[in-house]
């Protein structure tokens, strides 16, 4: 029940919560994109062999992760716009479409990363360096020994450790992207009144909230001006 309350979108807390989710998506998307770029530059560029064949870990960990990071940033920006323009249907549909696509992509990325980490741990990283070390698929031979070791342009033990150190954070960030995108989907469905997320009277509450926001801003500006005027009068009395 508590989880349902947190995921629900209402007129009181929904806009601010949607804005925070949008900011979180932008942050997580940028970090995930950066991790994918570092992973490619430090590890996976050594894995791609000259023949153009790429290991499955490369595809799942880098391509999908980078795409999910870029899309998460886009969803975060749309969520920020939707939180400030609650009565624009186009933003609702755009948020729903992008968030749903990002939810599926982030979930696929999480499953792919989990599979890549599991396979890499299971075979001790030998699958990552199979093209450079064709003779090291034998589990009885250490990674830093065996035929082909001297021909490899990188340290295979560092490739294994670095790949896991970057994959595991990317896995958690992809899962976070999926959860945040799911909330954006719920918010968009609630704003459009579709399916079980429909709430009676929500549009009227949002219209009242939109009308009250300019009045509240003006009231705060008047209060600030009054405080400044009082401070100025107090300063004049002090000088006198």
Swiss-Prot record:
Where would you find the membrane-spanning parts of this chain?
21-41, 63-83, 95-115, 163-183
As for membrane topology, the entry says: Multi-pass membrane protein
> Which Pfam families does this entry report, sorted A to Z?
BCLP (PF12304)
Q: Please tell me where this protein is predominantly located.
A: membrane
Q: Which domain of life is it from?
A: Eukaryota
* GO CC, any one term: membrane
Annotated family: Belongs to the TMEM54 family.
Q: What is this protein called?
A: Keratinocyte-associated protein 3
Recorded source organism is Rattus norvegicus
């Amino acid at each position: 029940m508590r989880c349902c309350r947190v995921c629900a979108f209402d007129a009181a807390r929904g806009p601010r919560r949607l804005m925070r989710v949008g900011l979180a998506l932008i942050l997580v998307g940028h970090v995930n994109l950066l991790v994918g770029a570092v992973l490619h530059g430090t590890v996976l560029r050594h894995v791609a062999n000259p023949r153009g064949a790429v290991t499955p870990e490369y595809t799942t960990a880098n391509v999908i992760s980078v795409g999910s990071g870029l899309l998460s940033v886009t969803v975060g920006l749309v969520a920020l716009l939707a939180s400030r323009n609650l009565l624009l249907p186009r933003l609702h549909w755009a948020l729903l479409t992008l968030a749903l696509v990002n939810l599926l992509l982030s979930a696929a990325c999480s499953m792919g990363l989990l599979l890549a980490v599991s396979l890499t741990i299971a075979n001790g990283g030998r699958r990552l360096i199979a093209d450079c070390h064709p003779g090291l698929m034998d589990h009885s031979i250490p990674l830093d020994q065996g035929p082909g070791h001297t021909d490899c342009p990188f340290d295979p033990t560092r490739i294994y450790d670095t790949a896991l150190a970057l994959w595991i954070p990317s896995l958690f960030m992809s899962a976070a992207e999926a959860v945040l995108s799911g909330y954006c989907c719920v918010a968009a469905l609630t704003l459009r009144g579709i399916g079980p997320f429909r709430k009676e009277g929500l549009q009227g509450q949002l219209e009242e909230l939109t009308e009250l926001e300019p009045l509240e801003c003006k009231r705060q500006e008047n209060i600030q001006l009054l405080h400044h005027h009082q401070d100025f009068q107090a300063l004049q009395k002090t000088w006198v």
